[in-house]
Amino acid sequence: MCTAVNTVFAENNNRGDTVNIKIDGSKANTSENFLYRGQGMISCNGSSRLLLDYKEKNPESYNKILEHLYGKNGLKFTHFKVEMGADVNTSSGTEPATMRYEDEKADVTRGAGFQLAADIKKINPDVTLDMLWWSEPKWVSDSSDVYAARYKWYKQTLDAAYETYGLVFDYVSANQNERTVDTDWIIYLSKTLKSEKDCPYDYSEIKIVAADECGTWGISRLMMKNKELCDAVDVIGTHYTSHSDDNTKKLAEEKGKEIWFSEGSSPMNYAQSAYRFDEGKSGLTGLNGVLDIANRMITMVSGGYMTLYEYQPAVAGYYDGVTYCHKQLINACTPWNGYYTLDSGYYMNLHFSQFMDKGWSFIFDACYGDAKVGGDGHALVDAKYSYITACSAEGDYSTIITNTTSEPITYNFEIANLAKADNEVYVWETRGPDEGQEYNANYFKKISTVTPENGKYSVTIKPYSMITVSTVNITDYASDAPAESENTLLALPYSDDFGYSDEFLSSRGNAPLYTTDEGGAFEVAEKNGENVLMQKITKDIKANEWGGTPDPTTNFGDDRWYNYSVSADILTDGEDSYAGIGLRYILADSGRSGYSVTLYENGNWIFFGGKKKVLDGNIADFDSSKWHNVKISALNNDITISVDGKKIIGYKAEEGGYSAGRAALYSSYNNCCFDNVKVEATDSVQPYVNKFDNFDNIFTYSENGWEHSTMDSFKNYKRTISHGTEGAYFTVDFEGTGIILTGVQKGDTVVSIEVDGKTVNKEYVISKISNRQSFLLINGLEQGKHTLKLAVVSGNCSVDAAQVLYDYEAVNKAVTNETSSVAESTDSSDSVPEDNDKSAKSNGGGSGKGSFPFVPVAVGAAAVTAAIGAGVAIAKMKKKKD
């Protein structure tokens, strides 16, 4: 039995590469505030937005994703926290406010968070709920009594969550996320909740979490000095550190306060291919890698007394390219096909969740971590010995161990005072691939069963791996995640006239399908009796910034769209207002991305390449009271723009073009409107690309001259990039009709280029360009297998990704009869509405459901035989300057 209370942690009982662990059940800590709480997730910053579309278009996938997170056969998360949005960007996107005006009834159908909470509760009713604010509505911050106004926002949101979804919140996080601790507000909130009588359930039972600082524990110091504050706070939570200070530990030991890791990272590494270049060839190492995150979850126990780890995010339910992207346990960004992936971090967390249940007691004598803070300040480095142990009241126990060293380590176990001390133990392992294996071949595998002798046994952990040693016996784990072939395209043409049903709109705060807002709030609204898409945030209600918010921007679609056009009917809204459209949207960190055009109410227009203004002009006799049709088209490096059917721009991108990406809509902070949005292919042969990371196996690098970064900026695709110096080279083996290379460049680099063994250009000059821009386009090859070789002649060349063009028509012809019959039987709501060729706003028509012809097109290099063209064209060829 686990009975005693003890917070003495394991000493360094390590002898060389052997560690002695004594697991003594009599030394387990059964104090309630020290019990294991498990893991949770935070829905914030737009990170869950696309899950609403999974729910609508592919409910089976949606339910599976939630089961993976909260189900008994998945991660068994125990906690869920939702951002109380304010329509400003809080890193990777906006969360809509429940109350934009003081006299507005709180609407918790806006955003994904509260609806997710309701659906999670259906899976596990015991999940605890929390909510936290990054910014607050303008009417709150402008109030003469901010605390009273803020409390009104809190309370009416709690009321609406119960009224709409039956949600009962267990916690509220009081302080503004990662900002100065406001002790008076924390006390005010606690007191007012405790005295609240007008409530659908007992709000006095809601516990207070504070103060969500980033890596610091100022709240603990303040609590030690202020009894009223100390009494108000039930849980001390902070972000991105596994080590708490003495004040915090004292509050846990003497005052019974719970300590939480109230926001922590998911792994960021691209394990699928990083194993080729990371330390140990595992795909699991390095800063912010799988083993780093596992060490944070282990060290937080001995180093911080923390009992709950909250992932931000657990699910990447947003598009690629947002700030801090490629950070998730589950990736879910293609709701039209229901595809998602369980990333390496998911399997890491299974080592905890499948063998330790909420309420287990830590045996602190068998918990240890010697990692140091390093890298970006969040990471733990130089860990050699890292492990935690917990037990159940029934006498089961589990120990989780990591090894981030290059040598195996043997752990000698001695078990005492536990009912199952002599039971068999099961060893589960996660590590990188052996030669010739798939990257995930050794994820979460049961590798041995050990029978103790007199309560003693030994287990050896391999380098760059993690194991769980447990008396808990679970069945072999088999993922039912979709196969890669199911990641089908959002095929063109695609259109949306926003004629959704009232039932659909009311279920999701008037959000259309597939859009993710980076600034502002784009919602379906009625205009002159018709549904349109309207930007709802105006300057007078724009909340104070948490970080930085671009002008209103939303984006949607498939990252693999390449040669296509975007058109929309637009209506500006008053003086200095503008509305715009864009394509090839790839990075959301600053609002504008790819190519875009904005049209002002006075007839002025501006054409942008990324954030840079490229061209501008004016349309004479422009009538801003009328709808106008704007269209932007891309065909390889050629961009054309028309207004009301009249061409105003013809532009060829010569330096650092933008390749495949999504569509976007732009607005000023006015109620500008959009309708009849259409996305159409401009090339029936090459409308799409297949994307590959520079670490994927189609790339082969010379042994010398390359520096491979497995954990870089989110501005790089998959956070990877390779830098080559003079003499270095790489080859890319691809199947298609052309290839695009992308990556940030310093400029003045000269490379030589070969295609299929033939020199195409000996002195190709690469100019200075930004992240994810293209520096090479080769096109016009016959459909088939090809090899590109690029060698650095002088300077430095970086490569981030490849985009392979292919003959889409040939792939379509190769679709099986079975697939064709599926497409033919697709519901009419997924068909393309007739194009009535109106250059301005049409009167009805279309499904209003983000319609597209469902054509399953498998990603990857398709084995097709059709040929197109015999020549080779290289965009932006230059001779080296004399």
Predicted regions and their residues:
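Glycan-recognition surfaces in beta-rich domains, encompassing non-catalytic CBMs
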Residues: Y464, N671-E818, V822
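Short, aromatic/His-centered strand-loop micro-motif at the edge of beta-sheets
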Residues: G609-N629
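C-terminal beta-sandwich/jelly-roll accessory domains of carbohydrate-active enzymes
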Residues: I401-G520, V524, D540-N544, K613, ...
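Aromatic/acidic polysaccharide-binding cleft in carbohydrate-active enzymes
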Residues: F261-H378
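N-terminal catalytic cores of secreted or lumenal carbohydrate-active enzymes
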Residues: N13-F169, A174, T183, I187, ...
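Secretory/extracellular carbohydrate-interaction modules
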Residues: T538-I606
